[in-house]
Amino acid sequence: MNKKVYLILGLFCLLEGSNLFAQTQKVKNQPYGDYKLYHFGITIGLNFQDMLLTNSGLPAINSETGKEETWFATIPNYSPGFTVGLIADLFLNPYMNLRFTPSLSFGDKAFEFVEQEFSERFKTTIRSNYLMAPVDVKIRSMRLNNYRPYVIAGAFSALDLGLKKDEPLLLKPMNYGITIGLGCDFYLPIIKIAPEIRFCFGLNNVVEKNRTDLTDFSLMKYSDALTRGVPRMIIFTFNFE
């Protein structure tokens, strides 16, 4: 009798387990989509531009007042910009892809200069429209039903198309750096959508010290206040592939 009870309980548990497993396993959309040798897509989102500043701390004589002034620069706040671009993806293996994602990122950086002794303040906004060319390796986890997390890492170069001369600050047009990020692919019946966050860390100094473009030399003190400025950017995007 006990054997029959155990057998019935065992069959019941087996059936219930199979039912639960069937509930957790869903029909996979685009089951072979990740195995294409190459594919293309678009990316669209927001960016927040920043800059890692190194102040010189050196005093300078104001040509108008004759006073000695020491200015320090900060970026006190951030405003969102717009990013749009293309995606070219090359399959390497089931867990790794090589990606080229050229994009345009429109935005600005708000600088505030504060004079140390007299507490004078000066604010200016520098517009930066970056044509970016990142090359990344995309490393993916195992796919679970219709989503698949991933991380990215790579390098980028960028050309600033929005620079204007005769401004309080002049930035060099070219910069380069490294990128890291993460996201998650969501597989829909005919398209794959991925929310992604990307961190871009510049490596070169873009503050132009040779200000031959200035017509108002009283602005030179703001360039002199900085010895180094390295761009940084956070980009939130949705990728459609």
Residue positions per predicted region:
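Predominantly the C-terminal beta-signal and adjacent terminal strand-loop region
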Residues: 27, 173, 187-241
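Bacterial Sec-dependent N-terminal signal peptides
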Residues: 1-27, 238-241
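Flexible, solvent-exposed loop segments that connect beta-strands
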Residues: 54-75, 107-128, 161-171, 207-226
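Gram-negative (and chloroplast) outer-membrane scaffold detector with strong preference
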Residues: 29-38, 46-52, 87-161, 235-241
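Short glycine/proline- and aromatic-enriched beta-strand/turn motifs that initiate or cap beta-hairpins
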Residues: 21-79, 239-241
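Residues that define the transmembrane beta-barrel architecture of outer-membrane proteins
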Residues: 36-40, 78-82, 127-133, 147, ...
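Short conserved catalytic/interaction loops centered on acidic-Pro-aromatic/His motifs
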Residues: 146-148, 165, 169, 190-194
